């Protein structure tokens, strides 16, 4: 089904690259995609959770990269994003 096909801008992306997207990039890259319905804040929250889970088994270098990315969202305007970033940093 075409609605479930991979979209340009999403397939093959690393979590860190997706987490770095601005709201404009999120909106631009999810045009026509059902993922757009969750909104930018939930997008960031979900990726923060994924990064926290990835952090558990990450190498020291990858943990540094993950932590650096998470820190960029530590003061996000959304409380839910801030809470999940804080959780992810403790994993």
Predicted features by range, described:
Residues 1-23, 66:
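Non-heme iron-sulfur electron-transfer modules
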Residues 17-36:
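Surface-exposed acidic, glycine/proline-enriched linker/cap segments
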Residues 25-29, 59-74:
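Amphipathic alpha-helical scaffolding segments comprising HEAT/armadillo-like alpha-solenoid repeats
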Residues 34-38, 72-80:
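Short coil turns that connect the paired helices of HEAT/ARM alpha-solenoid repeats
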Residues 47, 85-86:
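Conserved hydrophobic register position within alpha-solenoid helical repeats
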């Amino acid at each position: 089904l075409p609605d479930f096909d991979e979209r340009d801008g999403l397939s093959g992306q690393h979590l860190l690259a997706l987490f770095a997207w601005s709201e404009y990039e999120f909106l631009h890259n999810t045009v026509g995609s059902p993922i757009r319905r969750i909104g930018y804040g939930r997008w960031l929250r979900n990726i923060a959770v994924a990064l926290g889970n990835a952090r558990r088994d990450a190498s020291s270098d990858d943990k540094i990269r993950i932590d650096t990315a998470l820190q960029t969202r530590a003061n996000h305007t959304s409380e839910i994003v801030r809470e999940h970033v804080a959780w992810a940093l403790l994993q």
